[in-house]
């Protein structure tokens, strides 16, 4: 089930959402153009949990200093075309409505805050991991958590596949996002979320999702009639 768009109009131009997508794409292109391909960016700017918790360098390529900066830089990097493609698709589908609700400036802070929370959740789940962590998935997951609070009944047009048969259909956001987070929790429960030996950082996704959900509840997201911000307001 792949979300393509939602039927949830906005009142502002989502310039921050677009800027975040552009920034991620630019960084990904720079990774590809690096002298060592993606490895150059991966080694320098990805986050390694062991280096955060122990303060010791474990990768052969010197990381940026100080090491905690990689908590931010890693969320603008990706490991491949599908990685960035799906992250940016989810951000485009769901991010504009959260930006519409919060305003441009607060949305940017919200996005970055969820990304940091996601990184810390991954560090907490596997503090001794020496596997580099990268990707916007945790920050985007925070957007999904916020969307679930605000618009659970919104219709999301999804691409569905049944064997060789493909179709699109409208699915309530609560089912789309509920299916997504249950999948993350199930995968993490299998023990693969720590990323000790590589793979997907499921606990980062989970941490980002619940950070976004809780923050939106604290910001009044459960009110029955959320107020819209004035167009262009920061």
PLM segments and residue spans:
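A detector for small-residue-rich transmembrane helices and their helix-helix packing motifs
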Residues: 1-234
